[in-house]
């Protein structure tokens, strides 16, 4: 099964997450199929904290990829920001 989830990067105390499409059996930070965007929880004002390639996200969902709960929450957050802007 293919899943859209977060893959952690960054250093200790400074997390940075890539939003990736990966096989469910592969470890969290392991091999992935495609990188769809990123999430920076420590982004300051004026910095981009979240970017998602909506066209690729739609494609992967259409071919049956499951979205993790956290990524689903981030997608909704990005949609709210897009409407507000």
Swiss-Prot record:
One of its GO terms (biological process) is translation. GO terms for molecular function: structural constituent of ribosome. Gene3D superfamilies: 3.30.1320.10. InterPro entries: Ribosomal_bS16 (IPR000307), Ribosomal_bS16_dom_sf (IPR023803). It holds the Pfam family Ribosomal_S16. Keywords: Ribonucleoprotein, Ribosomal protein. It comes from the Bacteria. HAMAP family: Ribosomal_bS16. One of its GO terms (cellular component) is small ribosomal subunit. Belongs to the bacterial ribosomal protein bS16 family. This is Small ribosomal subunit protein bS16.
